[in-house]
Amino acid sequence: MDKDLAFLTRCSNEELGFLFDILTKKGSLSEFITTSPEYKKYGKDYRQYVELLAAEVQDFGSNTFWFRKDYHTVAKAACKKSGASCNSSDSTEEIESKMLAHMMGKAWEKLSEKDKNVFIDNCGYCGGDVCTFLVKKGASKFFDYLLRDGATASYQTSLIIANAVTRQTLNRGISFAANTLSKPLVVSTLAGTTAAGLTLGRLASVFAGPVGWALTAGLTVLDIAGPAYRVTVPAVAYIGCLRNIKKYQGKR
């Protein structure tokens, strides 16, 4: 298995199930998982054939451009196709983070001034750290910091994005995020305190529409290059979220 996807062996069947559905439902014309002996034997016990899921991500090829040797290359191409900038020297985690932050940044741009103010006011930092950071650095940088926080903020933000990706791609959210989405948002990178009055559920509701719009717009454009992008972009985004989730859980 590709070293950058080895962490998938630590994921639950529920977590892997969403990746399976992205690969098989969005790539229904060219996926090979559902015809494999492993799938026929184990069905929804995805942990039994996680290597097959990883290989499908790497080799997914509705057009020959997408036959890649390693996940880093696939992630880099998906990142650039999403509109985010990355370099070959970036680690896989950095590439995923830049892609996810870009998605959230584009969502922020589409928010009304009212919704932006709701976000800032609920954070309790208007005139403080978050407000100043957003003005000086921009939304993409802000969410990049949250994703790289390595603590609760990264975990919670990743759950929000994963929930948005699966809702947009599969028309259903991630059930394993339900409890966390009701807890207060912790922005430890910037202030080290709990954002007063802001829950992930409220924040998710603010970003659900714009993030969905960003993904829809991106996937519409990607149709021009070939249907493989409709799979690899949400797959890489979801994998990036899973990586942050497992990293956080591993520290507890």
Which functions belong to the PLM regions below?
Residues 170-252:
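Membrane-engaging insertion elements
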Residues 33, 50, 57, 74, ...:
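Extended aliphatic helical segments
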Residues 124, 128, 132-152, 166, ...:
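Solvent-exposed flexible segments
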Residues 1-159:
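Terminal export/targeting leaders at protein ends
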Residues 162:
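Glycine-rich anion/phosphate-binding loop at the beta-strand->alpha-helix junction
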